[in-house]
């Protein structure tokens, strides 16, 4: 690998790593204050779980030579312990292995949307290993493993047989995580109270900003080096993020009366999800359109979720699953032959076979991810209890599972502290939810005003 290409992949790796604290802050801000630390733990522990299993056998499952030549799953022993990529052979294989660790880990972190505030942490760790092995790894092999006839290497069927176009993981990462998060949410059931509003919008702002920065590495690094393709997909990603932000604010204004900051952050991420499978296959104007489309579809899906009381806490199915579908279908219809991928959508004279190949890949991805995740969670629940007790849920999962609290609010509603096993216990008068404190103070102020 050319040194300049390796330098860009290393830089992209660093950018993608920002998505983990970013997702922690985004998700932590979206729940009540008594769930923040558990949310952080679920996201960050994904990196720990996946790093271990990926080094042992995961890289072989994802990018190993397909067992039997069927394109279903790679050989888990081919890269066992990374033993055969420990020397510099000029291919950059070790760096790519690290890059794919981040892809797998962020996918698992997204699935935590279906478990937020109610899943035992130990059960989450076990679930993460099983989910990577039986859900993520096969899907990633189908999409990321590319045939090499000269060496006899056989990759995944979806990429090589179906010839499905997915630039950077719209299927293996986003649709997969969306369907899996929905399945996990259904198995676990709803929280006792779903009426908790985002407790900290500044956390959401910081988290969304880090995720956007990480996405430039996510898509840009997939280009494989410091080249025109990398610059192209970074720019289309930026444009799609803008389209998502504007699209979500518009539909929010039309249907809800006012555009919100939270909505603009959601739309931005939906736009980035939508461009992920399409970043190299659309024009700059097409990138804006696909971002806006992803946001509109996500808005509709979030509204549907609320109407059906599905407790997908961070809307992973609406934002990642549905926007990912929108991006893939956009390529099918509006792929621009002048873009680097050279894929012509149906409206640009492309093959009519796109009309069944792209939807087939989407349907298989959603069905497999949802079905196997539901099966894993259901069976696991027979052997170990997945959900915390009602008492622990009311107390707050941070205290129940981690013996810590993100906030300690005194009688004036200010102050921060934390309790660990190594420090003093926080007094019982602690109020865990900063939003509720604000509501109570406002009620007091209104009462005083009315009495004057």
From Swiss-Prot:
The superkingdom of the source organism is Bacteria
- GO MF assignments: ammonium channel activity
Q: Which SUPFAM superfamilies match?
A: Ammonium transporter
Keyword set for this entry? Ammonia transport, Cell membrane, Membrane, Stress response, Transmembrane, Transmembrane helix, Transport
Q: What are the subcellular locations of this protein?
A: Cell membrane
Q: Which residues form a coiled coil?
A: none
Q: Provide the topology term for how it sits in the membrane.
A: Multi-pass membrane protein
The UniProt induction remark is: By nitrogen starvation.
GO cellular-component term (any): plasma membrane
**Which residues span the membrane?**
6-26, 43-63, 94-114, 126-146, 167-187, 201-221, 228-248, 259-279, 282-302, 314-334, 336-356, 360-380
The entry's function note states:
Involved in the uptake of ammonium/ammonia (NH(4)(+)/NH(3)).
**Family to which this protein belongs:** Belongs to the ammonia transporter channel (TC 1.A.11.2) family.
Its assembly, as annotated, is: Homotrimer.
Q: Which PANTHER family match?
A: AMMONIUM TRANSPORTER MEP2 (PTHR43029:SF10)
Protein name (Swiss-Prot/TrEMBL): Ammonium transporter
Q: Origin organism of this chain?
A: Corynebacterium glutamicum (strain ATCC 13032 / DSM 20300 / JCM 1318 / BCRC 11384 / CCUG 27702 / LMG 3730 / NBRC 12168 / NCIMB 10025 / NRRL B-2784 / 534)
């Amino acid at each position: 690998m050319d040194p300049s290409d390796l330098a860009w992949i290393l830089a992209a790796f660093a950018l993608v790593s920002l998505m983990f604290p970013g997702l922690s802050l985004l998700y932590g801000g979206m729940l009540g204050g008594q769930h923040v630390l558990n949310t952080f733990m679920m996201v960050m522990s994904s990196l720990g779980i996946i790093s271990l299993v990926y080094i042992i056998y995961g890289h072989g499952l994802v990018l190993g030579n397909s067992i039997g030549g069927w394109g279903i799953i790679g050989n888990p022993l081919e890269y066992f312990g990374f033993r055969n990529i420990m020397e510099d052979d000029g291919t950059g294989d070790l760096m790519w292995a690290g890059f794919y660790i981040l892809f797998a880990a962020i996918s698992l972190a997204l699935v935590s949307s279906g478990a937020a505030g109610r899943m035992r942490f130990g059960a989450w760790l076990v679930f993460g290993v099983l989910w990577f092995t039986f859900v993520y790894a096969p899907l990633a092999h189908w999409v990321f493993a590319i045939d090499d006839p000269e060496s006899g290497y056989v990759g995944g069927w979806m990429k090589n047989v179906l010839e499905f176009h997915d630039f950077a993981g719209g299927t293996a990462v986003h649709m997969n995580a969306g369907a899996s998060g929905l399945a996990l949410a259904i198995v676990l059931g709803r929280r006792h109270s779903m009426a908790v509003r985002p407790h900290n919008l500044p956390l959401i702002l910081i988290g969304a900003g880090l995720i956007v920065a990480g996405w430039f590495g996510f898509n840009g690094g997939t280009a494989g080096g410091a080249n025109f393709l990398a610059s192209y997909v970074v720019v289309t990603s930026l444009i799609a993020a803008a389209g998502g932000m504007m699209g979500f604010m518009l539909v929010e204004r039309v249907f809800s009366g006012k555009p919100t900051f939270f909505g603009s952050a959601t739309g931005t991420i939906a736009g980035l999800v939508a461009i992920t499978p399409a970043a190299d296959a659309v024009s700059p104007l097409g990138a804006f359109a696909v971002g806006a489309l992803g946001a509109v579809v996500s808005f509709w899906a979030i509204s549907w979720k609320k109407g059906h009381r599905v407790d997908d806490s961070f809307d992973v199915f609406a934002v990642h699953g549905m926007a990912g579908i929108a991006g893939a279908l956009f390529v099918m219809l509006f792929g621009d032959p002048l873009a680097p991928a050279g894929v012509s959508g149906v409206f640009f004279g492309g093959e009519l076979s796109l009309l069944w190949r792209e939807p087939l890949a989407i349907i298989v991805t959603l069905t497999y991810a949802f079905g196997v995740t539901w099966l894993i969670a259901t069976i696991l629940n027979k052997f170990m209890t997945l959900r915390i007790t009602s008492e622990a849920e009311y107390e707050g999962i941070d205290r129940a599972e981690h013996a810590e609290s993100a906030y300690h609010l005194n009688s004036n509603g200010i102050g921060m502290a934390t309790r660990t096993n190594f420090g003093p216990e926080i007094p019982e008068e602690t109020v865990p939810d900063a939003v509720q404190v604000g509501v109570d103070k406002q009620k007091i102020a209104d009462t005083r005003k009315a009495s004057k």
